[in-house]
Amino acid sequence: MNTTVLSTLIGRTLSDNENVIEQGYGGSSQTTAGCFIKTQTVNSICNGTVVSVERDAITNTWCVTVWVNSQQWVRYCYLSSVKVITGTTISMNDSIGYAYKNLMKFEYCTSAKSKFPVRVSNQQLYKHDPTPILSGQLKLSEVI
């Protein structure tokens, strides 16, 4: 796992062999293509524009969607509070908000179809396994 990406996301340096990805989760179909990550603070792992800040009526948590480029978006979900608003341009390491009960969900979306559709504002996106991004195998400038 690429500790640089994860350290940026959680806002601190990981200690040797520390695993912040919640066991039993991961980027697979069982979690609708997202990784749950143990953290208090949530920081941006890339530059982009906040296109959506939505509140989930069931969990009463926030989800922030960031447009990275014409084909890629990242979502930071299960946030108890957020520090950004729609239209904000953010940079890598900028604070997004705080995780709900020290657990947030990171999602990677593109316009390429998958079995996990998600509607963001008026756009249909599709979730994909975020593990390659978190591991450093896939850069956000590359498209799956």
Please identify what each model-predicted range represents:
Residues 22, 77, 107:
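Residues in well-ordered beta-strands of folded domains
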Residues 38, 43, 53, 68-95, ...:
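Short histidine-centered loop motifs in beta-beta connectors
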Residues 1-63, 91-92, 101, 131-144:
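Surface-exposed, glycine-biased beta-strand/turn segments
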Residues 88-144:
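Conserved, short, structured surface segments that act as functional micro-motifs
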